[in-house]
């Protein structure tokens, strides 16, 4: 099935490993050229190498640094062309801790990466998308953002904020053929940060198993495609039914 993405330039943050790497590979499979952005520049380069040097580049970037983000977007546009697709995958989750035990720096880091970082990257590419009258913005939330999470006060708060941000971007982009949608994953692969609660959380999944990075990546590829051109402001949960209630 042709998703109509051949030749599109996609920027994926947090693309050095795991979920971000899967997102990049899925979009490359559909014919996109990839800009892999990550604080870990070597990891970003490895993802780009796996895709192929002729179709992907890696860029070291701290997305909390607004000036660096602007500079990297300029590099990407020089190397690959204007950014058509922005996948805000980069995120941070601290070691699970209740509010009474949470460190202020953990709150600040969650806000800086999960929320401000998403703003910085989207803000850098959105005007060009509007001007060219085509664009796709994907923001990564979490089921914890929709439901709350024990010991995840900062993470849950920032992920719910990302939903509001994306839906507002959707309104601003709608008349310019720029869509903005949210992916809210559940448990995707082993997660060391959630290890104290991991087994109990998996038991809450209706499918009784964790998801794989490709499950999220395939959903992202669809939302970026021409087949999803009338979908904007949506929140797609990729949870295996973790958010469903049953007796």
For every predicted segment, state its role.
Residues 122, 158, 166:
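Active-site helix of classical SDR
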Residues 174, 179, 231-233:
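Short, small/polar-rich loop/turn modules that mediate ligand/substrate recognition or access, typified
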Residues 142:
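Residue(s) in the substrate-gating loop at a strand-loop-helix junction
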Residues 97-99, 103-108, 201:
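Substrate-binding pocket helix/loop in short-chain dehydrogenase/reductase
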Residues 127, 171-172, 229:
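Alpha-helical segment proximal to the catalytic Tyr-Lys
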Residues 1-2, 93-96, 147, 221, ...:
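Short C-terminal tail/terminal secondary-structure segment
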Residues 205-216, 227:
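A conserved structural motif in NAD(P)-dependent oxidoreductases
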């Amino acid at each position: 099935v042709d998703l109509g993405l051949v030749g599109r330039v996609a920027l994926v943050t947090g693309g050095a490993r795991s979920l971000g790497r899967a997102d990049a590979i899925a979009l490359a499979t559909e014919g996109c050229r990839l800009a892999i952005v990550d604080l870990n520049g070597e990891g970003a380069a490895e993802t780009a190498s796996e895709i192929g040097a002729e179709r992907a580049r890696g860029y070291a970037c701290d997305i909390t640094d607004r000036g660096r983000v602007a500079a990297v977007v300029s590099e990407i546009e020089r190397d690959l062309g204007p950014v058509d697709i922005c996948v805000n995958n980069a995120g941070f989750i601290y070691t699970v801790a209740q509010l009474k035990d949470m460190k202020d720096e953990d709150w600040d880091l969650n806000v800086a990466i999960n929320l401000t970082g998403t703003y910085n990257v989207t803000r850098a590419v959105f005007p060009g998308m509007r001007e060219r009258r085509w664009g796709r913005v994907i923001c990564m939330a979490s089921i914890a953002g929709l439901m709350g999470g024990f010991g995840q006060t900062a993470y849950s708060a920032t992920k719910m904020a990302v939903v509001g941000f994306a839906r507002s971007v959707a309104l601003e982009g709608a008349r310019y053929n720029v869509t903005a949608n949210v992916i809210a994953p559940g448990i995707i692969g082993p997660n060391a940060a959630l290890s104290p609660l991991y087994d109990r959380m998996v038991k809450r999944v209706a499918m009784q198993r964790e998801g794989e990075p490709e499950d999220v990546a395939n959903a992202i590829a669809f939302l970026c495609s021409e087949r999803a051109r009338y979908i904007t402001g949506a929140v797609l949960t990729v949870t295996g039914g973790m958010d469903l209630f049953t007796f």
